[in-house]
Swiss-Prot record:
Keyword Hydrolase: no
Cross-referenced PANTHER family: REGULATOR OF G-PROTEIN SIGNALING LOCO (PTHR45945:SF3)
Role noted for this protein: Regulates G protein-coupled receptor signaling cascades, including signaling downstream of the muscarinic acetylcholine receptor CHRM2. Inhibits signal transduction by increasing the GTPase activity of G protein alpha subunits, thereby driving them into their inactive GDP-bound form. Modulates the activity of potassium channels that are activated in response to CHRM2 signaling. Activity on GNAZ is inhibited by palmitoylation of the G-protein.
GO molecular function (one): G-protein alpha-subunit binding
Lineage: Eukaryota, Metazoa, Chordata, Craniata, Vertebrata
Secretion signal, residue range per the UniProt entry: none
An example Gene Ontology biological process: G protein-coupled acetylcholine receptor signaling pathway
Name of this protein: Regulator of G-protein signaling 10
Region (Disordered): 1-35, 157-181
S-palmitoyl cysteine-type lipidated residues: C74
Compartment(s) where it occurs, according to its Swiss-Prot or TrEMBL record: Cytoplasm, Cytosol; Nucleus
Length: 181
């Protein structure tokens, strides 16, 4: 089931949607109640560019942004068809996230089995097991904390305020209380 969800994610979103320079959505305005979608599953959060942006902000504060960056890089890698590009991306993923000298090393089992020699013959699912480990780490650790974080709750409140502005009667009652005191 998990692999199908990840595969579904791979097909739905082109790489450019998740790799905007600032991580923001190209539409500039998100659908109503996106936080409700984000809260329903990590998959839904990762399908939404604004959700990815907020999750990255949270993970950066937790010093674990490399997890979502690795996951996103693997999603992009799986969509690569050109063998030369695939080889270049595989080496970049390895050097950035998996090697002992990685600048943003992720903590996964089995990374030592991936050697530069294996990277010379890459295939789209070569990082799948490691990506699944990181997904599960995020799902059962970071994601639940994100949903309780000030960053998420503030975004949800802002979204609710934009959707449900106080009606005129409520505003009039507030005004009368202010001026009658």
């Amino acid at each position: 089931m998990f692999t199908r969800a990840v595969s579904r994610l791979s097909r739905k979103r082109p790489p450019s949607d998740i790799h905007d320079g600032d991580g923001s959505s190209s539409s500039g305005h998100q659908s109503l109640k996106s936080t409700a979608k984000w809260a329903s599953s990590l998959e839904n959060l990762l399908e939404d560019p604004e959700g990815v942006k907020r999750f990255r902000e949270f993970l950066k504060k937790e010093f674990s942004e490399e997890n979502v960056l690795f996951w996103l890089a693997c999603e992009d890698f799986k969509k690569t068809e050109d063998k030369k590009q695939m080889q270049e991306k595989a080496k970049k993923i390895y050097m950035t996230f998996l090697s002992n000298k990685a600048s943003s090393q992720v903590n996964v089992e089995g990374q030592s089995r991936l050697t530069e020699k294996i990277l010379e013959e890459p295939h789209p699912l070569m990082f799948q097991k490691l990506q699944d480990q990181i997904f599960n780490l995020m799902k059962y650790d970071s994601y639940s904390r994100f949903l309780k974080s000030d960053l998420f709750l503030k975004h949800r409140r802002t979204e609710e305020e934009e959707e449900d502005p106080p009606d005129a009667q409520t505003a009039a009652k507030r005004a009368s209380r202010i001026y009658n005191t």
